[in-house]
Swiss-Prot record:
One of its GO terms (biological process) is pantothenate biosynthetic process. It is found in: Cytoplasm. One of its GO terms (molecular function) is 3-methyl-2-oxobutanoate hydroxymethyltransferase activity. Keywords: Cytoplasm, Magnesium, Metal-binding, Pantothenate biosynthesis, Transferase. Pathway: Cofactor biosynthesis; (R)-pantothenate biosynthesis; (R)-pantoate from 3-methyl-2-oxobutanoate: step 1/2. Homodecamer; pentamer of dimers. Pfam families: Pantoate_transf. One of its GO terms (cellular component) is cytoplasm. The gene is panB. This is 3-methyl-2-oxobutanoate hydroxymethyltransferase. Its EC number is 2.1.2.11.
Amino acid sequence: MRPSELTQLKQDGRAISILTAWDGISAALVEAAGADVVLVGDSLAMVALCHATTLPVTVEQMLHHTKAVGRGFTRPLPQQPLVVCDLPFLSYQCGEDKAVAAAGSLLKHSCAAAVKLEGAEPEVLAVIERLVRMGIPVMGHLGLTPQAVHQLGYRRQAEDPRSQAQMLQQAKQLEQAGCFALVVEHVPSSIARCLSQQLTIPVIGIGAGEDCDGQVRVTADLLGLTPSQPPFSQPLIQGRQLCVEALQGWVKQLHQQAKTATTTTSPPEPDC
């Protein structure tokens, strides 16, 4: 899967599926599920590294996990999902050169074929244009942007006409800057539908209604592996509970075997 193929999927009216992965096991599961895109999201800071936000994760950690994702795939390269890696907090907000170095490292040394950036500030748009000129595909991200949690929080975005008009303008700027797709998170379905209709590039929703060109979800949320999930990403199974019950069964069985062994007559010790 290549970035340009996602636009063709939009034109064909076929929904685009994006799931996150953070190691080899999760990558193998997502690949087997048939997802179009694997996102190595900075959400791994919370899912895999137990941080409270996405902010602490570094470029080096993103590279480490993206390499693991690549090793988890089992299909030949042409049949593998497109891998998009998040550029973490402060890896692209501090200048174009730093952003190029971070994105270039991810594409050179891992299976990533594209990067994702949050926001549409003038500085971010300049970074996107620079990356695209250098041959690095970029996915945009508007709405609830976790890297701006201390400024915006985790609340729903673009709920009034003024902010919706601003989001539409930003989305068009991201498309003009060269983004091949756009994620919109935790926004009203009406604005997501408007973006999908007015943009040529695919609009991928998460908590943005069903009228987008595709959907993205955190795999651990869908599997019920996280302690809690956002309202727009309810689990399909109670994976955490199932795993705990399976492991408890193993521990219980082992303890019972040990108890049985201590109550039976032990054979005489061999002479050494």
